[in-house]
Amino acid sequence: MTLITDSESIGVCESSYTPEEERRIVTELNNEAEADLKEGNLYFVISNRWYTRWQRFVGLLTEEFRSGEPSEVTRPGPIDNHDIIDSESDASDPQLRMMLEEGVDYTLVQQEVWRKLVKWYKGGPPVPRKLISQGFYTKSFSVEVYLLCLTLTDSRDESTTIIRLSKQASIGQLYEMVCAGKGVAKEKARIWDYFEKKKSVLLDPSSEQSVEEAGLQFNQDILLEVDGSASSQFVMSLAENELAMVPLEPMRSDAMDIVRGGGTLSNGHSNGFKFSFFGRNTFKDDVSSRTFGKGEKRGLGGLQNLGNTCFMNSTLQCLAHTPPIVEYFLQDYRSDINAKNPLGMRGELAIAFGELLRKLWSSGQNTVAPRAFKTKLARFAPQFSGYNQHDSQEMLAFLLDGLHEDLNKVKRKPYIEAKDSDGRPDDEVAEEKWKYHKARNDSVIVDVFQGQYKSTLVCPDCGKISITFDPFMYLSLPLPSSRTRSMTVTVFYGDGSHLPMPYTVTVPKDGSCRDLSNALGTACCLDNDESLLLAEVYDHKVFKYYENPRELLNGIKDNEHIVAYRFKQMHKGPGKVKLEILHGEQEKSSDRGPKCFGTPLVTYINKEPLSGTDIATSISGLLSPLRRVHMSCVVNSGNENGHVPDESSRSILSRDTETEDNDRELSLSLLRDYYSFNLQPLESDSVVNPGSVTKVLVKWNEKEHEKYDSSYLNDLPKVHKNVLAKKTMQEGISLFSCLEAFLAEEPLGPDDMWYCPGCKEHRQANKKLDLWKLPDILVFHLKRFTYSRYFKNKIDTLVNFHIHDLDLSKYVKNEDGQSYLYELYAISNHYGGLGGGHYTAYAKLMDETKWYNFDDSRVSAVNESEIKTSAAYVLFYQRVKSDSETSDMKMD
């Protein structure tokens, strides 16, 4: 029996087009699609790993080695989307893994481009998504990558069904989908919003409202009831069914009592409060329990994660523990709402935020589901809609801007012509600019968060100096980035002589695969007649071989798994091809084929017809270090002192304890390709014509696990693991050094040149920033994420920041006599890498010194000594007023 080669079995359609022709065709198709954007256009989600390889192949991405030489590229294999597909999803209906990021994990290509790529390269699986229109004031197009996922409970038999639909689908369309799937007449069906297994709102079958506007959240429950069927266990209590009487504005005298623990807020009548009737779909957020004990602390409520909303929850908790903001929103702020501001959200965002803040401060230590706020956020900021992970600082920037516009007391903004400083004193110009700014922008956000900095531009040619004073809401501070990176790579022996061993090496951040190979060679004592083959392992398969020494390392992410296969030079060379050995085992609860596990092994074989016995012998040699040692062998091989041999000696010893007959008992199958995972049994008399890479699957059963220790194949370490261990102050950098880097003089970039009024030309001027006026609430954004054309990176450097007595006086150029001493009260943290990770918040209650960790719905106390970590991303400080300022306030 003759088996075809792997390159034939994959069925790759070798394109007759050159790379240049492929690039031209795709570029033309993209231009045509851009000119014809409309709702409903179809796009396909494609693995960014594969697409980046294709871009390099056709010249859409070009990389250079540090010497300036271009990096060589090879033609990519079949399209492989398995790295972005949830491994637990059905093969007939593949679902994307959660928390994927566009440009990092996946790329979107329009339908005609997808068709061409599939024609040229085959592969898949296809993941189609539609273009939708979003936005309230201005419409924008976006591809709905993640559909809304709902769990439908049928009250008749309590069965559950997963439903996926567009967030823009109407409630009426939801009824049609459910009724069609359940075979129920629409007029007999009732669908309830069943959030947290509670019947809260009966959805209207005739409603054109979208499921997103109705407040339905990712992975939440909905309940189907059918007329004439019993469903008593789903009866809703009267309290759940009535319209909420949401307290809008407490009287000023009681507001801070709530914050400090006095007084109560309820969901019913209470003296001293004004009420407004709202339906569930506007401002009635769900609180898991509306009662709390007497004297229970307020402000310790958690926020439920509604589907990758930890970024939002982190920001909200920091703002919900900002004293002047809490005080303002717990008092009567309605008179400040500017519903007619064309730059605002008609006051809806401010009211949604105010009601959410009120829930947090009235819920004791219970959890609040911010559904109404998220619905408003998605309406006015479609970039935060859907279920992708986002940036907490970007969320903060939008929210502060949005709240300002909703609460801007200026109804008509006067036109004010900008004036140059013309040599006038700085304090005069700064005061004038601030006055003009306040004439157009007057809100609590400006009063609390906004400061002013001085910007000085100097023309390098004529010496013209231009000084301006501009407002700021927060300070984005640069972090110094290391020029090197550490990488952990596991080395496997291609001849099966030793056990695999992980090595951690330091390489240049902009280095190449040659740098990594050289560093690994030194670490593992590579002989002169040996070489290393680098590869990326994903989902227990070899995703890519790094055979070009010039290929840059910046394409390797920290969360990836890289291995190196060690070979004698004699094992490689002309006439040799790769034999790739994968490991699989049958899942007991599944009737599908074997599931891969562990790390593939790689060796080289002759490029000539081979028998199944030849293949089995090669595989047995690679597995030999993993053979378990029988106790009798260990005892007999010990030295006279009874010492047990080391692992390498034991593996060699055990190899001699097995017979060649046992070597051939392995269950082997030829793997045609990763995409279809089509297996063909490999018998001893089979004849294999090797291709460039021949893939063979070893099926492990109890016998194999008894004979071999597969633990050495598992637990492959990541390239770099983010460790948030406690570090000393000397290991990090100070917040002051970051601030000084922000304020340092530097030339403008070539793409950001300044028009010099003296030269009448654009010049690459020198720019210097100085702090002039600092706000009561000062926010520092630590710029941990860096972006370049080919690479995105997170800087995990520990920033040593002050918790108490942050004195910024020497950085403020305005001598106004104010105190610029600050106390830290909240931190937005980011854990993990790019395109995902997790956000939390540290915050302390007003009038308390105790800190708390807000991790979505989980709230716990934390020691002050533990809040300084390399996860700190956004720092919130409150200014400590001087004695004279405090006295002036008392007199007022």
Swiss-Prot record:
Q: Where is this region: Disordered?
A: 69-89, 636-660
Domain DUSP, chain residue ranges per copy? 17-132
A biological process (GO) annotation for this entry?
Answer: protein deubiquitination
Q: So which domain of life are we looking at?
A: Eukaryota
Basic and acidic residues bias (residue ranges)? 643-657
- Pfam families, alphabetically? DUSP (PF06337), UCH (PF00443)
Q: What is its EC number?
A: 3.4.19.12
Domain USP span(s) in chain numbering: 301-880
Q: Which GO terms describe its molecular function?
A: cysteine-type deubiquitinase activity
Q: Which reaction does it catalyse?
A: Thiol-dependent hydrolysis of ester, thioester, amide, peptide and isopeptide bonds formed by the C-terminal Gly of ubiquitin (a 76-residue protein attached to proteins as an intracellular targeting signal)
Q: Which organism is it from?
A: Arabidopsis thaliana
Q: Which family does it belong to?
A: Belongs to the peptidase C19 family.
State the function annotated in the UniProt record: Recognizes and hydrolyzes the peptide bond at the C-terminal Gly of ubiquitin. Involved in the processing of poly-ubiquitin precursors as well as that of ubiquitinated proteins.
Name of the protein in its database record: Putative ubiquitin carboxyl-terminal hydrolase 11
- Alphabetical keyword list: Hydrolase, Protease, Thiol protease, Ubl conjugation pathway
